[in-house]
Structure formats: structure tokens, C-alpha cells
Curated annotation (Swiss-Prot):
GO biological process: regulation of transcription by RNA polymerase II
Function (record text): Component of the Mediator complex, a coactivator involved in the regulated transcription of nearly all RNA polymerase II-dependent genes. Mediator functions as a bridge to convey information from gene-specific regulatory proteins to the basal RNA polymerase II transcription machinery. Mediator is recruited to promoters by direct interactions with regulatory proteins and serves as a scaffold for the assembly of a functional preinitiation complex with RNA polymerase II and the general transcription factors.
Main location: nucleus
Protein name: Mediator of RNA polymerase II transcription subunit 6
Region (Disordered): 191-246
UniProt similarity note: Belongs to the Mediator complex subunit 6 family.
Length: 246
């Protein structure tokens, strides 16, 4: 197939002249369409001949060749202009349609262009799906065909994970947390305490016993000391008598 020239494909372009938009109506739309800078207008049409001879558009019915007519008008937004080949006063062949929306001229696509575009879009999607499926397909003479998806899993693992920034807490939140922790400590006191850094934690009951000796142990110690004093006194004999010197 021969390559289509961009200048011949007018479906992808538009044309507008802002100076005509305020005065655009059914009587002036053909004059607007026949501007020299309009790429959709054919200079060899019968409209140009009628314009040069200063005749009315009714004379187009008596001529043979390419002509432009106003097919539909919905002022001031929409106008439809048809390009047709006139063969006789009663026989014409439509060639193309153009629509003007808010002063901008477009060429209406023909049925073949619409079908071609839809089929091309569908084929492109199917081809992309097959290419994606073939990238996961593997074959080995001993194993046959199988699907392999580990490459994408490894790529996902290599991607660095974005860490969420921790938002600083407010003063109210910190005071509230401290109050809750103090309340929990009073309800559930700790069973082990580490008195010095590096030492093993000691049960709380044992630390209380070491800090505060019971009164019974003190009394027993006092009794033992009193008994020891009495025993030492009992073991000593009576004082020795000294001899008198005469």
C-alpha cells in the first residue's frame, strides 16, 4: 500500500478565522468556507466561478462539476456543508461533509475511515496482549511450555520501599500518654526492679525485705544479746581473796 500524504489526509486538522465568528450565519457561512486560507476549500469548484461572475448560488444547479452547498444549519453554533459532484440538475454524488462548530471547521470522517480506525485500535490492543503474554512464556525440550513470572517479582523486590515520615506528636498527646502509663503502673506495679545498670533485676518483695527488717527479728536479736551477757556473768567465779599482810 502506498503511504498516505499528510496533506491529503484532512481528518486530523481544523481551521478557524476568529474575525468571521461574530457575523457567522446561514447567509455568510459559504463565504466563510471559501476563504483562501481554508485547506478544505477547492479553488476549482463551481462556487468560485459563480463568485467571480457575481452570480447567485441558484446557477449552480445549471452547472456540472464540484460544488459546495449548505446542508444543515443550527445557528449560531452548528453548520454542515457538503462537497458534491453535480452531473445534472437532478443528479449529484456526495464527496465529503464538513461541519462547523463555534466557527471551527472539521472534515467529517467517512464510513471507511471510521471502520479502519476502530479495527486498527482493536488489533493494536490484541497485539499488545499477545506480546505481553509471550514475554512470560518459556519452553524447554524436556519440560515443554510453561509460564514464568519471577522476573517481575524480583523487580518488585528491588524497588526501594518508600518509608512514611513519622509525624511528631502534639503536647496534648504526650501528656495524655504519660497519664495513661502512670495509671497503668499504679494498677499493675512491676514485679522486678533493676537497682543498678548491668545488674540482674530483683523481685520487688525481696528489695522491700532488705530495706525494712521486721520487728520480730530485732526483738529476737535483743534477747540473744541479753542471754549472752548473763552467760558470761555466770561463768565468772567469785572474786579471789587476797592474803592480808600482818
Amino acid at each position: 500500500m502506498a503511504a498516505v500524504d499528510i496533506r491529503d489526509n484532512l481528518l486530523g486538522i481544523s481551521w478557524v478565522d476568529s474575525s468571521w465568528i461574530p457575523i457567522l450565519n446561514s447567509g455568510s457561512v459559504l463565504d466563510y468556507f471559501s476563504e483562501r486560507s481554508n485547506p478544505f476549500y477547492d479553488r476549482t469548484c463551481n462556487n468560485e466561478v459563480v463568485k467571480m461572475q457575481r452570480l447567485t448560488l441558484e446557477h449552480l444547479n445549471q452547472m456540472v462539476g464540484v460544488e459546495y452547498i449548505l446542508l444543515h444549519a443550527q445557528e449560531p453554533i452548528l453548520f454542515i456543508i457538503r462537497k458534491q459532484q453535480r452531473q445534472s440538475p437532478t443528479q449529484v454524488i456526495p464527496l465529503a461533509d464538513y461541519y462547523i462548530i463555534a466557527g471551527v471547521i472539521y472534515q467529517a470522517p467517512d464510513l471507511g475511515s471510521v471502520i479502519n480506525s476502530r479495527v486498527l485500535t482493536a488489533v493494536h490492543g490484541i497485539q499488545s496482549a499477545f506480546d505481553e503474554a509471550m514475554s512470560y512464556c518459556r519452553y524447554h525440550p524436556s519440560k515443554g511450555y510453561w509460564w514464568h513470572f519471577k522476573d517481575h517479582e524480583e523487580q518488585d523486590k528491588v524497588k526501594p520501599k518508600v518509608k512514611r515520615k513519622e509525624e511528631p506528636s502534639s503536647i496534648f498527646q504526650r501528656q495524655r500518654v504519660d497519664a495513661l502509663l502512670l495509671d497503668l503502673r499504679q494498677k499493675f506495679p512491676p514485679k522486678f526492679v533493676q537497682q543498678k545498670s548491668g545488674e540482674k533485676p530483683v523481685p520487688v518483695d525481696q528489695t522491700k525485705k532488705e530495706a525494712e527488717p521486721l520487728p520480730e527479728t530485732v526483738k529476737s536479736e535483743e534477747k540473744e544479746t541479753a542471754k549472752n551477757v548473763q552467760q558470761t556473768v555466770g561463768t565468772k567465779g567469785p572474786p579471789e581473796k587476797r592474803m592480808r599482810l600482818q
